Amino acid sequence: MRRSSTAARRFRRTGVAVLLAAVLSTAAGCGGSDSTSPATGETRPDTAGLVDLGNGRSIHMECRGSSGPTVVLVAGLGERADNFMITSADPTSDEGSVFPAVAGFTRVCAYDRPGTTILTEDGFESSRSTPVEVPATVDDSAEDLDLLLRASGEEGPYVLAGHSLGGPIVRLYAAAHPDDVAGIVFIDALSENLGDGLTAAQVESFEQLNSAASQGRPPGSEETFYSTAVVPLLRDVPAAPPVPTIVLTADEWPLTAEVVESGRAAGTLPEFVTVEFTDALWASQLVAQDVLAAKF
């Protein structure tokens, strides 16, 4: 088992691909290559479309790459699968993004949770998966992930990469299905300890900051985050399986004092987002990430 807390910029997405390659290599070095690889010589086609879960719902899933263990990318709050196929530098191109980079050396899949979106030049586009009543919980999302992987025909065990809210989903899935997990990468993952360094008012501000209204996402179909629902689940979640694990944490905070002040002045950030709040959130995040890394 590998324990690691690695600093990297939030959107240096090719770096994520390198770390995924490291996890795959470590898993193979631990004797996991036979169990994590599909049938020798099998060529798997690229796929994109709806996967029928068998319960009246379908989830949009895209997979690329023809060999090696399957990496499953689990996006952050409100983010569609194709957020892994763009970069902050150029949201119109997949060049330098995680999905094609990982597909260059192994099989990779990403999917739309219900209520997720992507921001395009024409505005927000909604999830391509069957809508569900919101708010859905992270354990609902972990169960959906299990149903999706079983229905898709993608072979495990899988290397799971969870960004932000995707981190708790990965942890719950891994705890429930340890034999189906070959490795884990957490990317700025939400943890149960994030609120430990915040006041009750700051925790409430964090939830408001992650609301659809604060982010400009369309109402009615949005994915929603409530710490009061997520934190108890994570505090009680069983230990993850003993597989190679990396905790990847940003070393730069995007909400600097300059960004906060200019955002408030322009009306792009709510009034409750103060420099004091964002500084406290950043400090608490760094501590929480160290605590998360110590769990593995």
Q: Model-derived features: where do they sit?
A:
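Conserved hydrolase catalytic core segment
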Residues: 152-193
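C-terminal motif of bacterial Sec signal peptides marking the signal peptidase cleavage site
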Residues: 25-29
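Conserved acidic catalytic loop of the alpha/beta-hydrolase fold
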Residues: 139-156
